[in-house]
From Swiss-Prot:
Organism: Caulobacter sp. (strain K31)
Source organism superkingdom: Bacteria
Entry's Gene Ontology molecular function annotations: 1-(5-phosphoribosyl)-5-[(5-phosphoribosylamino)methylideneamino]imidazole-4-carboxamide isomerase activity
Protein keywords: Amino-acid biosynthesis, Cytoplasm, Histidine biosynthesis, Isomerase
Main location, first listed in the record: cytoplasm
Gene3D superfamilies, per the entry: Aldolase class I
SUPFAM superfamilies to which the protein is assigned, alphabetical: Ribulose-phoshate binding barrel
Name of the protein this chain belongs to: 1-(5-phosphoribosyl)-5-[(5-phosphoribosylamino)methylideneamino] imidazole-4-carboxamide isomerase
Family affiliation: Belongs to the HisA/HisF family.
A GO cellular component annotation in the UniProt record: cytoplasm
Enzyme active site: D8, D129
Catalytic activity of the protein: 1-(5-phospho-beta-D-ribosyl)-5-[(5-phospho-beta-D-ribosylamino)methylideneamino]imidazole-4-carboxamide = 5-[(5-phospho-1-deoxy-D-ribulos-1-ylimino)methylamino]-1-(5-phospho-beta-D-ribosyl)imidazole-4-carboxamide
InterPro entries linked: Aldolase_TIM (IPR013785), His_biosynth (IPR006062), HisA_bact_arch (IPR006063), Isoase_HisA-like (IPR044524), Isoase_HisA-like_bact (IPR023016), RibuloseP-bd_barrel (IPR011060)
Length: 241
């Protein structure tokens, strides 16, 4: 299992939100590049970056902060938030992003996601952000009428690298990961599934690894790392076991 430390960008700073609420942002580092370097020193092999302003505005906003991260580290970066055109995908891949995450556009224009996956095989992930059983859009400010499995099945066999499933009700709350919800999606699709939202302790990582059925490909760690409820070395050892 791959563990992805998260850097969420708001107004150029590294923050964590509670339940995706932009008004409930805690700043953890004024330098995203410095935070990225810390995660590399901790031993992580991937980095998960989200442009929060971009997710709301529908276009990349924290461009300078993302570029500073890309210039400061050598591990692969997956980036989401406001990327809704093929030109946007191409620009970030050319800038050095290893995997682009598409969320809102996956709901509204699935053909664009399929085309992106064909153009950049294994470099496109789909964000499946769930609130009250339905997939959220527009920086989690709106709800679609799709459930996670219906959305995930849209992208079978087109070269999508991963589905990143987030339980919004648990995001940033340190309340524990929704193993059942993540597992249901993983069992229903052939695309690797990455768990996000509420991963609070190494016990959550152990629960994801121990569940029967399809293996969970990864987990995103956010507030748990910043708050110190997960120690990187211990988590990485468990994930690699």
């Amino acid at each position: 299992m791959i563990l992805y430390p998260a850097i969420d960008l708001k107004d150029g700073q590294c923050v964590r939100l509670l339940h995706g609420d932009m008004e409930k942002a805690t700043v953890f580092n004024n330098s995203p590049a410095d935070q990225a370097e810390r995660f590399v020193r901790d031993g992580f092999s991937w980095l998960h970056v989200v442009d929060l302003n971009g997710a709301i505005e529908g276009k990349s906003v924290n461009t300078a902060a993302v570029q500073s991260i890309l210039e400061s580290i050598s591990i692969p970066v997956q980036l989401g938030g406001g990327i809704r055109t093929l030109e946007g995908v191409e620009a970030w891949i050319e800038a050095g992003v290893s995997r682009v995450i598409l969320g809102t556009v996956a709901v509204h224009d699935p053909d664009l996601v399929r085309k992106a996956a064909r153009l950049w095989p294994e470099q496109i992930a789909v964000a499946v952000d769930v609130r009250d059983g339905k997939v959220a859009v527009d920086g989690w400010t709106g709800l679609s009428d799709l459930d996670a499995i219906t959305l995930g099945k849209r992208f079978e066999d087109v070269g999508v690298a991963a589905l990143i499933v987030t339980d919004i009700s648990r995001d940033g709350a340190l309340t524990g990961v929704n193993v059942e919800g993540v597992g249901e999606l993983a069992d229903a699709v052939s695309i690797p599934v990455i768990a996000s939202g509420g991963v609070a302790s190494v016990a959550d990582i152990e629960r994801l690894k121990a569940r029967p059925g399809v293996e969970i490909a990864g987990a995103i760690l956010g507030r748990s790392l910043y708050a110190g409820t997960i120690r990187p070395a211990e988590a990485l050892t468990i994930a690699a076991a």
